[in-house]
Swiss-Prot record:
This is Amyloid-beta precursor protein. Zn(2+) 2 binds at H677, Y681, H684, H685. Changing V717I: In AD1; increased amyloid-beta protein 42/40 ratio. It holds the Pfam family APP_N. Changing V717 to C/S: Unchanged amyloid-beta protein 42/total amyloid-beta ratio. It comes from Homo sapiens. Residues 732-751 are annotated as: Interaction with G(o)-alpha. Residues 18-701 are extracellular. Residues 523-540 are annotated as: Collagen-binding. Residues 391-423, 491-522 are annotated as: Heparin-binding. Residues 268-281 have a biased composition (Low complexity). Changing R676G: 60-70% zinc-induced amyloid-beta protein 28 aggregation.
Amino acid sequence: MLPGLALLLLAAWTARALEVPTDGNAGLLAEPQIAMFCGRLNMHMNVQNGKWDSDPSGTKTCIDTKEGILQYCQEVYPELQITNVVEANQPVTIQNWCKRGRKQCKTHPHFVIPYRCLVGEFVSDALLVPDKCKFLHQERMDVCETHLHWHTVAKETCSEKSTNLHDYGMLLPCGIDKFRGVEFVCCPLAEESDNVDSADAEEDDSDVWWGGADTDYADGSEDKVVEVAEEEEVAEVEEEEADDDEDDEDGDEVEEEAEEPYEEATERTTSIATTTTTTTESVEEVVREVCSEQAETGPCRAMISRWYFDVTEGKCAPFFYGGCGGNRNNFDTEEYCMAVCGSAMSQSLLKTTQEPLARDPVKLPTTAASTPDAVDKYLETPGDENEHAHFQKAKERLEAKHRERMSQVMREWEEAERQAKNLPKADKKAVIQHFQEKVESLEQEAANERQQLVETHMARVEAMLNDRRRLALENYITALQAVPPRPRHVFNMLKKYVRAEQKDRQHTLKHFEHVRMVDPKKAAQIRSQVMTHLRVIYERMNQSLSLLYNVPAVAEEIQDEVDELLQKEQNYSDDVLANMISEPRISYGNDALMPSLTETKTTVELLPVNGEFSLDDLQPWHSFGADSVPANTENEVEPVDARPAADRGLTTRPGSGLTNIKTEEISEVKMDAEFRHDSGYEVHHQKLVFFAEDVGSNKGAIIGLMVGGVVIATVIVITLVMLKKKQYTSIHHGVVEVDAAVTPEERHLSKMQQNGYENPTYKFFEQMQN
């Protein structure tokens, strides 16, 4: 019986995995899906062979909006009629992720949750209902929520019936990845636990798996991109630096031995974190010790949703795991966390965890314990290497607190309306107005707290980027000052410094793009500041690269590598700017009325006009060769003006030599007052090019429009007057002109006829004829 049931379940699962909508898609082997992992090119399912393929354009990476995900599905599957997207129920392991600008793809897998690209008219999933399981469904026509919300509703409904959620699917789409209901299958706890135990027994011989991170997580995370652009910057920056350290090819053997590969270190940390119990310890003591530990994110920066047992609350709570390190109080699901830790803790905690939670099934549960000082705690804590994780937790606590307060107000509102049924109409309106004002006040307060949280996070990220850039610049200068200087070491330090500057520029552009999407007016206000900051970055890079010419022997040896490095960075910059400035943005609602950056008259050009980016462009005042720089055995030469001829009038801080160079002198760029107050400026050779609107031409256009308007108004008035006169002259009111040559009797007869006189003779003959 059991083998037959297993074969039946396997066949049904295989049929569902290969199931695709039948809207003209006969012959497809797999369902259209896309997967994203920040820092790597997007992947999509090849519907012809059932394998994952990399992004065909070689430029698209993680997308942070559902509209963008839908558009990307339509781009990679142009022959299919993609109408919607929905997050998959289960994560998958995908290998061979490619990085933008790199030819070779890494072989180690990443664990992500893909998005299903729905084809044609929406059709609900066919769920398999095993024996002793129940099929349930919930619909709310007044609710339009995400996949995560309905998954939570299904899980809580099964928990209330003392069952486990076996499978689920969405019902009644109402937007992009939003639905009005869910269908799900609940199975008894005993059978689910048997299935879990059998699966664990096949995969691992140990009695208890403590939820530690596998090596597959060392460099990856689940692909849930739900935050705005600035919330992901720290994770992306640190992951990029880790990958850059892997790809660096140091020429010095000592450095290669000293520097440890990133993934080997994370694998060793993971293996230490997942060490099982020794034979001398009892299982209960170890479980109690593990479940009493605090949640740890770890040194990595992935954002994997996990659960840990909170001793103070007596239940499992969610947190974000970095992907490596941490401790063993780390579980995939809330059910598994409670199964391991709930039975091993004290009886009081056990009773607390076994009490059913009376929650509204259509309300999102609180994802983190809310405290009154949730934001204050984050603001008072100084920033550190775990800034992104701290920001995520603070944001979750803030949202949880806001949801709790809104729920409390709504309950009070319902109770007040129930009590005010018999009150006069004026009193009912007063009650409604009172609670409306209260809700608006809570919304405004939450918005202010969110803004304060984001601004603090942005400031800390900028400070972190500045510290890294300063450290990279100091290492670069130290490498140049070494006696004798090692060219390979100098190049590696220069490469890290250039990347640090590029990270700063990327962060600035990403922040500006986010502000432009959220608040176009504020983006227009900060545009000049962004442009000035980008120009300062290029000035600083020019001055730093000019130091390389003070050591001509090193400059000659690493010429090709530096050209290749700068060309690669320039190509990446072209892609970033093309995506952020030129790429059209699909939006829904009022956001679609926002003007595109490319439609404005202000032109932003952050790159050279000719598209080339090499050391010669950054150093037009020098050419490679030993003859171009006078020899100096002590490496003390006069500093070179690292700017084009048009900018050499700008004052800079003088320096006495390479040995006296300070980081602050290079990072500080002074601008002439006339340059700063000018309405527009233009800088070539990797400088910012900014064309402001011509104020004079605008005034002339306005005057011309005013004169034209006056002329048109005058013509209209004259035309109306003439028409009115013509209308008056055409009215006769029955007056008949009389010839002056007629006799007085005839004139008198005409007047009598005008006054109604009728000749009796004529009247007599008319009556006779009638």
